[in-house]
Each structure stands twice: as structure tokens, then as C-alpha cells.
């Protein structure tokens, strides 16, 4: 046995232990993935395929932010920011999957934005040898899309007609919240309401992903002394379960 084939869970189950029933909380159910994880871009504005915000982007932790995404359709989402993003990006809490605002990391982010703008202008020249610079925390090197105007950015994102109007209206509405110091949609704290006004403007596309399971989901239920319990939640004498074979490892997800 390899130790990673579920043997421990199966043996306990065959001995009468109770297997965690669905729905089973997952791990890292961020809902959005490559080229980056939207949950670690809380300073931006997130909109869905209908060009509408759908949550407070600035929840305390990356996991809580990412959790909002699993309730959305499995369609492309977008993070929108302006040219001041390198400043805004530094406003974050020390945490797992956070941004370490060192000088080199901030510069790496600036380089990513400048590269996107150069590609937009048609002046970008691919370097002879691509150096692997500092990532600056998760997904700093995400591929940005740049434009001089929000209208042009909407075009690049594929929004037309009513969708484009909805996109522009949503950003305008959000910017008003920034001016007023109160997010009337989702209650984002005034201290982290960063406007999208300074050109050039940038966006990142995010595609849906169900998650990244690293450990057992839906294992054997135990009591506080690691006794496996039966279907009536009574401890089974002499049968103990711990580690990756345990169920109920997470509440709603990896938080």
C-alpha cells in the first residue's frame, strides 16, 4: 500500500466507523484560477460575466475571499484596476497567500503592468532571455490586459452593447462609493476602497476551477479523543483515527 490510496479510511469504514457524509467542505475552493487566483487580488474590483460586482473583494483572508467565488457561475470573471494598483496592492494583511510589499515585489508588479501597456501600444519587445523575477506573493506576475480607457478595456474583454454599458456603469458606481467612503453594495471598508480612475486601466481574466485538494476530504468521523465513531456517533472501542484519515477537517473550506 502506498499510504495514499484510502486504505486507512476503508479499513475503519469496514470496521463500522462513520464516513463523513455530503456535502463535504473542500480545500482551497477558490473557484477561479490561472493565470492567477483572484482571491489574492482584493484591491481590485471583481465583476462577473454580466459585468456586475458580486461580493466584497476585500475579505480578511484569501480563503474567505475565494469562498465567494464558488457560488458563482463557472464562467470567466474579471479583476479591474487602474495605474495606481502598485500603491493599492500594498494595502493587505499579513496572511497566507498575501502580498509581501518589498521593493522588488512592488517593482515586479509594476513591470507586469508596464508590459501589458507596452503590448497594448504595440511597442513591446520580447526580451532575448526571459528572466524569472520575484513573484511578489501569489500571482503578482498574472497577465494583465491594458487600455487607455475603460471603454477600450471593455472592448478587449469582449463586452459589447448592453454588457459594455453595464460594465462602465458598474465601475462608475463603484468609484462613487470610493468618493463617498461607503460601499453601498457589499460593505467593503472605506479604508480599502480603491478607485478605478487613473489611466491606463488594467484587467485580469480568471477562469473557473473547482479547487485544489491537498488532503483527504470526507474522512472518518472521530470524537475529541480521536476515537472513530459509529453511525450513532458513539465511539468504537479500540478504533482510533487521526491525520489525513479524519473527516470534518474544515468548516466551509480551508480557513
Regions found by a protein language model. Give the residues of each.
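Alpha-helix capping and helix-loop boundary segments enriched in small/acidic/polar residues
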Residues: 1-3, 34, 38-41, 233, ...
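A conserved FAD-binding loop/helix module that cradles the flavin
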Residues: 1-10, 246-255
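An anion/pyrophosphate-binding glycine-rich loop and adjacent beta-alpha core
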Residues: 9, 18-159
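Residue-level detector of alpha-helical segments with a strong bias toward transmembrane helices
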Residues: 26, 61, 236, 253-254
Amino acid at each position: 500500500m502506498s499510504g495514499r490510496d484510502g486504505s486507512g479510511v476503508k479499513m475503519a469504514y469496514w470496521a463500522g466507523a462513520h464516513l463523513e457524509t455530503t456535502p463535504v467542505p473542500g480545500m482551497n475552493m477558490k473557484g477561479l484560477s490561472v493565470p492567477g487566483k483572484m482571491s489574492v487580488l482584493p484591491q481590485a474590483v471583481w465583476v462577473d460575466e454580466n459585468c456586475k460586482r458580486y461580493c466584497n473583494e476585500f475579505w480578511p483572508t484569501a480563503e474567505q475571499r475565494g469562498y465567494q467565488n464558488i457560488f458563482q457561475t463557472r464562467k470567466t470573471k474579471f479583476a479591474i484596476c487602474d495605474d495606481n494598483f502598485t500603491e493599492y496592492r500594498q494595502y493587505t494583511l499579513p496572511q497566507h497567500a498575501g502580498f509581501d510589499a518589498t521593493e522588488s515585489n512592488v517593482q515586479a508588479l509594476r513591470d507586469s503592468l508596464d508590459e501589458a501597456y507596452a503590448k497594448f501600444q504595440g511597442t513591446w519587445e520580447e526580451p532575448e532571455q526571459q528572466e524569472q523575477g520575484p513573484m511578489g506573493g501569489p500571482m503578482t506576475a498574472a497577465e494583465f490586459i491594458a487600455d487607455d480607457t475603460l471603454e477600450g478595456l471593455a472592448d478587449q474583454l469582449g463586452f459589447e452593447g448592453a454588457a459594455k454599458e453595464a460594465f462602465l456603469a458598474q465601475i462608475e458606481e463603484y468609484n462613487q462609493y470610493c468618493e463617498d467612503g461607503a460601499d453601498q453594495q457589499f460593505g467593503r471598508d472605506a479604508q480599502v476602497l480603491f478607485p478605478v480612475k487613473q489611466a491606463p486601466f488594467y484587467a485580469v481574466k480568471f477562469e473557473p476551477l473547482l479547487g485544489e485538494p491537498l488532503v483527504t476530504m470526507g474522512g472518518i468521523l472521530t470524537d475529541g479523543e480521536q476515537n472513530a465513531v459509529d453511525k450513532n456517533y458513539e465511539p468504537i472501542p479500540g478504533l482510533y483515527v487521526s491525520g489525513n484519515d479524519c473527516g470534518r477537517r474544515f468548516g466551509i473550506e480551508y480557513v
